[in-house]
């Protein structure tokens, strides 16, 4: 169970972490720009 959790976590963090960071930056900028305007 531990080896499977480690492999799933590592893959999610490397692939999901990079994609989640890009999506969060775009969502924050869009929401801030709309509220500022």
Curated annotation (Swiss-Prot):
One of its GO terms (biological process) is chromosome condensation. Residues 1-37 are annotated as: Disordered. It is found in: Nucleus; Chromosome. Its main location: nucleus. Keywords: Chromosome, Developmental protein, Differentiation, DNA condensation, DNA-binding, Nucleosome core, Nucleus, Spermatogenesis. Testis. One of its GO terms (cellular component) is nucleus. GO terms for molecular function: DNA binding. It comes from the Eukaryota. Protamines substitute for histones in the chromatin of sperm during the haploid phase of spermatogenesis. They compact sperm DNA into a highly condensed, stable and inactive complex. This is Protamine Z3. It comes from Scyliorhinus canicula.
């Amino acid at each position: 169970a531990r080896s499977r959790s480690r492999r799933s976590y590592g893959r999610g963090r490397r692939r999901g972490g990079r994609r989640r960071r890009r999506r969060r930056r775009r969502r924050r900028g869009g929401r801030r720009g709309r509220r500022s305007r």
